[in-house]
């Protein structure tokens, strides 16, 4: 029995290597996506976004405001425009990504204690660019306004310390936990890595099993063990090694990570068997999984918070292993969660593994029934 089981394991390994589609997906594509997908995001934050300034005041304070905006890491004042039409031309040519307008009498209104509105235009189609420009402008305007107000109070005879307390009665210190740089890569890549594991494993199983009858006996168990073992190695590469290479924050215990990852991979494997039994052709499985890729990303709760999803979608999403595995693995790897914090996810993954295994067996028996 044991010798026969190990022979089946050897057959499963050989099947992966001999099948071009499975080999390219489970070996090549996993490494390719995991290594090359992060490249555009490795700078973490936006730096030196080019903007144009229309200074209609030309005063000392307007120039100081522009200097402070330009001093921000995220923004660089690269152009000075005479009017809005010329700035708009630069914007449409993509030579700049934002326009800042300092109004006339800016300095006079500011020194008189009146509101001095500043107008900013940015590309709302790119939320990162829009947010960094708004942040740079707000910080510069706030610091300059506070400095002018403190100067006005001290000129009226108020002590400097008291004036600063009046201008800023509450000093807030923000500490970005688990993502010190506030970077986009540190936010999105840990979740994407988990989805890469899921999608390539499902596609590999689809290449190997779709349209082919089950060998029966010990073969399905041997196949499942080989797939889970192979992707357990990939989990170490993708969830431990690559975050270290890319300097992504990771403080979790590797043993706890595997306590979640192995049941997750088992559930994905069982799902792959079920999909391969329900969809008769290899091409159909691949098409189904490619179409499903983007919805799975949204259902994972990374870019679309689960609290904002319709209840129907939230319920359906629990049938996908990544829905609960992604936040659990992120909590373990990036936030240092302990085993008790993710034990519910482990039970969900085991339940999904059992449910999809039963579905795969039922689908196989249903397909064989007409020929009996």
Regions found by a protein language model. Give the residues of each.
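Residue-level signature of the transmembrane alpha-helical core
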Residues: 27-31, 192-193, 224, 228, ...
């Amino acid at each position: 029995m044991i010798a026969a089981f190990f022979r089946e394991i050897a057959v499963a390994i050989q099947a992966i290597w001999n099948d071009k589609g499975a080999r390219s997906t489970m070996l090549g594509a996993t490494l390719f996506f995991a290594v090359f997908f992060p490249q555009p995001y490795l700078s973490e934050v936006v730096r030196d976004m080019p903007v144009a300034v229309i200074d209609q005041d030309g005063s000392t304070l307007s120039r100081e405001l522009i200097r402070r905006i330009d001093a921000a890491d995220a923004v660089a004042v690269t152009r000075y425009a005479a009017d809005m039409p010329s700035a708009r031309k630069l914007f449409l040519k993509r030579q700049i990504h934002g326009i800042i307008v300092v109004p006339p009498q800016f300095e006079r209104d500011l020194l008189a204690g009146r509101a001095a509105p500043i107008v900013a235009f940015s590309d709302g189609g790119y939320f990162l660019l829009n947010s960094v420009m708004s942040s740079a402008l707000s910080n510069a305007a706030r610091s300059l306004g506070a400095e002018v107000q403190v100067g006005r109070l001290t000129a009226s005879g108020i002590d400097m310390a008291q004036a600063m307390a009046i201008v800023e009665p509450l000093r807030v210190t923000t500490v970005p936990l688990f993502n010190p740089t506030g970077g986009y890569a540190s936010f999105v890549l840990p979740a994407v890595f988990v989805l890469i594991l899921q999608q390539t494993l499902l596609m590999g199983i689809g290449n190997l099993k779709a349209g082919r009858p089950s060998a029966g006996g010990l073969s399905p168990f041997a196949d499942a063990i080989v797939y889970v073992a192979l992707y357990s190695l990939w989990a170490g590469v993708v969830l431990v090694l690559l975050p270290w290479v890319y300097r992504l924050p990771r403080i979790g215990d590797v043993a706890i990570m595997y306590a979640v990852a192995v049941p997750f991979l088992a559930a994905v494997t069982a799902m792959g068997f079920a999909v391969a039994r329900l969809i008769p052709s290899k091409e159909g499985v691949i098409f189904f999984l490619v179409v499903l890729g983007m919805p799975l990303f949204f259902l994972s709760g990374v870019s679309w918070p689960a609290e904002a999803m319709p209840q129907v979608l939230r319920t359906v999403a629990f049938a996908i292993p990544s829905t609960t595995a992604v936040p659990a693995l992120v909590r373990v790897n990036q936030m240092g969660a302990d085993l008790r914090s993710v034990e519910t996810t482990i039970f969900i993954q085991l339940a999904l593994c059992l449910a999809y295994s039963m579905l795969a067996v039922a689908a196989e028996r249903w397909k064989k029934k007409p020929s009996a």
